[in-house]
Amino acid sequence: MSDPAPTLAFGLDSVRQLLDARESALSPLAAREATSRGRQRPEAPQPLRLAFQIDRDRIIHTRAFRRLKHKTQVFVTPDSDHVVTRMTHTIEVQQVARTIARALNLNEDLTEAIALGHDLGHTPFGHAGEEELARLLPDGFRHNEQSLRIVDLLELDGAGLNLSFETRDGILRHSKGRASVTSDDGWGTPATLEGEIVKLSDSIAYLNHDIQDAIRAGLLDEAELPPLARRTLGEDHPARINHLVTDCVRSSLVTFEAGQPAIVLSASTLEATDELRDFMFERVYHHERTLEGAARGQRIVAALFGYYEAHPDAILGWSLAADPPSRRAADYVSGMTDHYALERARQLGLAD
């Protein structure tokens, strides 16, 4: 006679208890579901996922997230298949941020959710498209505000994702000022350390992958990077990433122990990183070839915005019918991929 089939050792209640136990083992400084400021619309807890994991999963399944794979980062309509897109940038930010969060015993789910959602609001043609919409829209346009607008209002046909406050805050406050990789851009410091991690990880990721893109494009050589950056951060891409992540963890732990927790870089690493950032603006972001592509992207964005503002009935979703035509046009155009924007401009006779 055969042995009876084994019974299931754990029920859903046990799964939830395990998740709660794992979260309770995080650093006292970590964000937790139990102390979250909640969602805009209350929801019952789920047995298999905690709040910030739900946020992360909802972001991954959005249309805006899928479109990131066809939005360029710096180089408009690049020739190489290896040039960074908003999608690959987002994944790199997620990887760097999760490594830091795990090392500091902070909430990885929240960190990932913020990282995956931080650039949902970016326009086609990189920052050039953002700058053009900022010029055209009466109230201005910022990609971080648009990212929040997407998760709050535009996804799910206007219902939004109903994300946790901490995820929404991190998405809004990830943007940085021009002065330094750690400066804010008018939105202040994120409410959580996890949000601070993503803000710094964004800089770590874009500076390093933009160097690789610029080298492939023939705009510079590794040996031309500032001596201080090469000496302090490392001679190549892996060394720089490793140094920046390790320095961040080490320096942040010092602030934890001092009772003034923050996500920071050491003074020497920050100086070298800011010098590298200034170098990239001078040699890459303001290079003639980069600016030529950006100008073309801006012309297309301006033409599409003008058309849809004048013809709001032609907007196929991705906007709120009650909004004024300018806002609807901005939502629609900013949601386009580079390819779709180019194709629509050609179809409408707007391409140059």
Q: Where on the chain are the PLM-derived regions?
A:
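Histidine-centered, transition-metal-coordinating active-site segments
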Residues: 1-86, 90, 95-100, 107-108, ...
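Short, internal active-site loops enriched in acidic
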Residues: 119-120, 177
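Short active-site segment of divalent metal-dependent hydrolases/proteases
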Residues: 121-125, 205
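A glycine- and small-aliphatic-rich helix-loop capping segment at beta-alpha/alpha-beta transitions
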Residues: 126-138
